[in-house]
Amino acid sequence: QNFPQLEKFYFNYNVATHDDDDFIFYDCVCDQFISSFWIERQWFVEVAYTRATISIIIKPYRQKWYEFINIDNDDFNVYHSTLLTIRYKPIDEYRQTLLDEIEWILDVATIYHLEISEEDFFIGAIIEIMNLLPDLDSLKLSSITLPTTTLLSIEEREEINFIVYNNEITKVYLEKMNKFDDVLFLIDLFPELKYLQIGCTSDIDINLFLQIILMKINNKTDFNLHLLAISIPTADDSMMKRMQNIIDSKSLLFNYTIKRTYDTIFLRMK
């Protein structure tokens, strides 16, 4: 209203977290930041958690990783753009505090995208966070630590099963795969998955990895994966050709396209 020609706007509102169990943002007015006023102006809202602060960040809208590849041929819905970023890994005794703070944010905002930038984040903690965010469409993880299945309690297994049957996440990006089981677990956890991007190290046996992943996908009924992206520093046209040869020789896919963009090879399944 006062700046009708304003095109770019950056704003960062920080609130220090408290140590008490009854954490409340006494002075925060986040409902003013997470509103249609900003969305209608194509300004992007991000809620970021660090160990000491929670930030409400407003900045010009820019494409995120989940928007560069249009799977459904739909226009991006800016009203579904609110992002929650977690930039620290709470120890077990403070995990509930993080969950309580996320619940507070949900009183004023619906979160559609979640990014966790800390490495080796325990998947059990991720599932607890996801339980609070039923509207999630995308999930970006730095790297994960899996549970030992034999040591899971009945309650933990029930929680995993609940997420499998109730989440609607369609896009997942794992920046660093520690072992093949990381990807296999994510495929099982997200039955609505349409786009999966995996970051691999240069020493990976790409042929073995590709066979294991595609066999896993082929063995799942009603699985909707349309696009598999494999990011690897040594990716080149020769690697892409080897991948194509292994797919064809093993009959892993019949109707697909393969292409490379810089260090990422994209397998689109039709």
Where are these regions (language model features)?
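Eukaryote-biased activation of long, low-complexity terminal tails and linkers
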Residues: 1-270
